[in-house]
Amino acid sequence: MAAATLTAAAPAQATAHPACATPELAAGWYGDNRARLQQLIDQYGRCNPYRPSRDKPVAVFDWDNTVVKNDVGDATMFWLLRNGKIRRPADWKTTSRYLTPAAAQALATACDPLALPGTPLPTGTPEGAACADEVAAVYGTSATRTGATAFAGWDRRTIEPAYAWLTQLLQGWTPGQVRAFAAAARTENLAAPIGTKQQVGTTTATGWVRYYDQQRDLIKNLQAAGFDVWISSASPQPVVEVWARGVGVTADHVIGIRNTTRDGKLTTHLQGCGSVADGADSMITYVDGKRCWINKEVFGVRGAAAEKVQPAARRQVFAAGDSDTDVTFLRDATALRLVLNRNKNELMCRAYDNSDGKWIVNPMFIEPKKQKTTPYPCSTTGYTGHDGTPAPVRRADTSVIPDQTDTVF
C-alpha cells in the first residue's frame, strides 16, 4: 500500500520541547507500517502536542486477534465449561432474547437434568459432556448439535448474539468472580504451547493465547507519548479487564460487553448505549455499536447522538482492528487506522481501497493468513446490512468500492 502523510497535521507552530524524548517503536512491522506509526507518535505525542478538544489524543484498539492472537472470550467460555462454572437458568430462553425455541429446547434437554436452576452445571464431568457440547455448539457455530439455527432476529450491525450470550451466561456470578475465572483461563492459555488444543466436552478447541509483542510495544509507546489508550472489545467486560492489564491498560479504559447487575451479581441482560436502554440487549461493542460505546465512554456523548459520527475533535486519532466488527470505529479514526489482515471482506475492502490514505495493513504477527486467492467481493457482497442482506461496500460518498486483491500477507 502506498504511504500517505497524516492529514490532520499538528499546528505548524508546535515544536518539540528540548527536554522531551519521543518514544521509538521497536521493529517487527510489515513494510513502512512502523514508519507510519512512528509518524503518528511524533505528530500527536506530547513532545509535539496536538490537542483538538482533549488533554490527550485518543487511540482505540480492538482486543481479540488485534492485541492478542486468538480470542479471550473463547478462552473464558472453554474454561467455564471445563470447570463447571455456568449456572443453569430456569429457562434457557431467558439467556438471550435472540435464542430460538429449537436451541432453548436442545439446551434444556442436554443440560437441565444435571442441576437445579441457579446452580452450576457439571460440564467438566463425563455426565455433563453432552451439555458442554450443546453449549459449545450454540456459542461457537450459532447452531445446535443437530444443525438447528440457534439465534434469530438481531441487527447485524449492533450485536452478535453468540458473543453476547457468553456474557449473559455469566449470570449469577459477581464481576470479581468472573475476573478470577478469566485470570485462571489466562494463566492456562499463556502457558500452553502455540497450537495447543484442549478438550471441551467430547470435542477439542483452541487452548492457547499470546500477546502480540508489537502491539504491546505500540501501546506502551503511545501511552509514553501521552496518548489516551482504550480497548473496545466484544468479549465480556470483566474478562477483558484482566487481560488488558498485561499491556498496561487499566479497567477504566476497557469497554467490553457489560451486563446489568442485581444485588451485585451479573444478570442475563446487557447495558445499553445511545437510544438503546439497559436491558434491551441490542447494542453491544460490535460494528456500529463500537462507535456508540466509544462515543459514550471516551467522549461523553449521551443519548442517540452517541450512535452518530462525531466532529473530528471528538473522535479517536488512531484505531486498530482485525475484523468486520471493527470497521465502524476504524473509519471514525481521524489520522491512522491499523488493520491486521484476517481476510475479512468489508474491512479489507475499505483498507485496500484506502480512499483517504489513512489505512495501513499488517499481516497477523503469529500464524499470518496466506494470500486470499480470489479478490474481496467489494462490489457485490462485501457489506452485511442490518438484516443480514449482503450488499456492495460503499465509500462515504456512496460510490462502490471495486473488488480488491489481497496484497499484504
Residue ranges and their predicted role:
Residues 18-27, 61-64, 150-151, 162-168, ...:
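Charged, low-complexity surface segments at secondary-structure and domain boundaries
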